[in-house]
Amino acid sequence: MINIPTSILCRLGARSAISRSFGTSVVTKSEAKTPIQKFGWEYLKKQRDMKRPIAPHLTIYQPQLTWMLSGFHRISGCVMAGTLLVGGLGFAVLPLDFTTFVEYIRGWNLPCAVTAVFKYIIAFPIIFHTLNGIRFLGFDLAKGVDNIGQVYKSGWLVFGVSAVIALAIVINSCQNKSKAVKTA
């Protein structure tokens, strides 16, 4: 009689059982499709043959303030979150802090007009995202959504107030910079 340890037999038995179950449960790609999946696949192939995009494309929609503000709200939120993530990780890993970074930029001695443009590019999305977020909170409370005219008025108001506040911030920072130069 051959003396084989039971642990080996158990392992071999488990392996053969596993391989048998995998061998019988494999389904080919064509068999795995349900009728609705087949319909969807045929529909997509037909659309591709007609040279249509898979999903609706921005070029087929008429530009409207509502979806443009909503899109800019999402984009500005993602850009700000990404900036905070990359900046936070950068300042955590690199051997410099925010003050050193600002002093490095100031060392370039850029004219006020150039820094004003960059400050506006930074300030406008932050203010817009904040004000439009408040507007959307009002929409969540069902305030002003029943009248499309109100929706457009609030959208233009948010856009205009954001532009004015961002401009005021930039003008204030340039005035503070010129005062600091005069006192130095």
Swiss-Prot record:
It is a multi-pass membrane protein. InterPro entries: SQR/QFR_C/D, Succ_DH_cyt_bsu_CS, Succ_DH_cytb556, SuccDH_FuR_B_TM-su. SUPFAM superfamilies: Fumarate reductase respiratory complex transmembrane subunits. Its cofactor is heme. Pathway: Carbohydrate metabolism; tricarboxylic acid cycle. Heme binds at residue 129. The heme is bound between the two transmembrane subunits. Keywords: Electron transport, Heme, Iron, Membrane, Metal-binding, Mitochondrion, Mitochondrion inner membrane, Transit peptide, Transmembrane, Transmembrane helix, Transport, Tricarboxylic acid cycle. It holds the Pfam family Sdh_cyt. The keyword Membrane applies. Gene3D superfamilies: Fumarate reductase/succinate dehydrogenase, transmembrane subunit (1.20.1300.10). PANTHER family: SUCCINATE DEHYDROGENASE CYTOCHROME B560 SUBUNIT, SUCCINATE DEHYDROGENASE CYTOCHROME B560 SUBUNIT, MITOCHONDRIAL. This is Succinate dehydrogenase cytochrome b560 subunit, mitochondrial. It comes from Caenorhabditis briggsae.
